[in-house]
Amino acid sequence: MNSEYSKRSLVAVVDDDESVRESLPDLLREFGYAVQAFASAEEFLGSGDLVRTRCLILDIAMPGMSGRDLQRELQRRGWGIPVVFITANRDETLRPHLLERGAVECLFKPFSDTALLAAISSAVRPA
């Protein structure tokens, strides 16, 4: 990965699980990403970080607005932020459906650091 590019890339983590919001940013910062964590989709939408976000790591099942609902809302608003979904739901039919709707990747918890970093690298890679 081009480390200069990664330093300009804000990765937003949206997950209602506090342990995910604490651990993922630490990992991603080690690899040069700027990271902001949010406890809900609504919190992310209300932040000033939409413009800077280059990749969204998004839990599927959250109270209030779900991850899929947030993806649809961003698409409705014309925000083409690449999404990497993460989920504890092992339903294998989810992944192809999410990829069909524009997600970069769907990772099942627990996932490897390598798989997550590969998905983010793919999401932030310049076209």
Name each model feature, range by range.
Residues D69, R90-E105:
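Alpha4 helix (beta4-alpha4-beta5 surface) of REC/receiver domains from two-component response regulators
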Residues A39-S40, S66-L70:
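Acidic catalytic/metal-coordinating carboxylates
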Residues A37-C55:
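Acidic, metal-coordinating helix/loop segments flanking the phosphotransfer/catalytic sites
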Residues E18-Q36, R101:
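Two-component/phosphorelay signaling modules centered on CheY-like receiver
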Residues M62:
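Receiver (REC) domain active-site loop signature in two-component systems and cognate sites
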